[in-house]
Amino acid sequence: VNTAILIPARLASTRFPNKMLAELDGVPLIQRVYNRCKETELPTYVVTPDNEIVDLIGKDNAILVGDAENGTARCSLAADFINYENFINVQGDMPDITTNIINDVARLLGTYSVVTAYTKMSDDKRSNPDSVKIIHNGQTAKWFGRGITGYGDHHLGIYGYRNYILNDYGNLERYPEEEIEQLEQLRWIQNDVKMGVVEVEFNGIEINTKEDLNKWQKQV
């Protein structure tokens, strides 16, 4: 199936400004994520409002878009410029993303129009608001939240979309919970779009804060 990877990235991160350019073992974060995604041999594009990121990745591999409310909306804008049936959205803070995870998400798009991934969550992460929890029944997602404690699995920042559903994202109703939780994926759930889920193996670090960056460096 005609599939491309989109990596939404911006410099104006609230918790960690210029995070995308922060170096991990001498390589900028967004470059490292891009390199990992390219290992799949799927066409890969960084989607960004920032010329600095375009200059780093190269104009042939980046799509410059205007203002967007979140990463999914950014990907929806980018989908207008390139012609693919399916898209995989990999967050720009995942330097340890693997080909296996991307392939697992892509495969499930044969069944669902929107897909995401999760991994089992350790007890210490369950009380951490930076760790997004997913409630699911093993087949589809039922809810996402940061403040959930004591149950749920760890939601990974990767999604799969069929082209038509991604294009429709901006037309879906936005509910208060999306704003409160700061979780754009709630829009699918609250508009009754079935989101397929797949359990994956992931032992890496997602770079949300400078502390995460330091933790990653120590593991190298």
Model-based region annotation:
Residues 1-4, 82-83, 109:
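Catalytic phosphate/metal-binding cores of nucleic-acid and nucleotide-processing enzymes, i.e., regions
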Residues 41, 84, 110-114, 193:
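Short, high-confidence coil segments that cap the C-terminus of an alpha-helix
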Residues 2-48:
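N-terminal glycine-rich phosphate-binding loop and ensuing alpha1 helix
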Residues 51-107:
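Short phosphate-binding loop-to-helix
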Residues 97-175:
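Conserved core of the sugar-phosphate nucleotidyltransferase
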Residues 152-220:
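Conserved alpha/beta core of the MobA/IspD/sugar-nucleotide pyrophosphorylase nucleotidyltransferase superfamily
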